[in-house]
């Protein structure tokens, strides 16, 4: 079972310093119209040990310097599925530049040319045999 840590606003400096090599990342927003109407509401990170960090950003100022230091760190690979939305939301609200990303949807389209099924559900089923 995964260990889950919840944070309001930002991760701690200790957590930021503990994140090495690669992390999985996903975001949630109040909708898809960013920045016109919707806001970034949740950031989820999982480290290489399966430890999950759930960050609820401060929607008044979106200050998260420790998280930004991780997102901008070129030595840490950020892995996610269909990162276009996540990356743009993080960059807009946190005023940062997310570096060194690996998008599993793009990788699927490049490598799995035998199908047009590139959704996360399809990848999990094919590679992990899970539904």
Residues covered by each model-derived region:
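A short, charged helix-loop
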Residues: 122-131
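Conserved RNase H-like, two-metal-ion catalytic cores of nucleic-acid enzymes
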Residues: 1-122
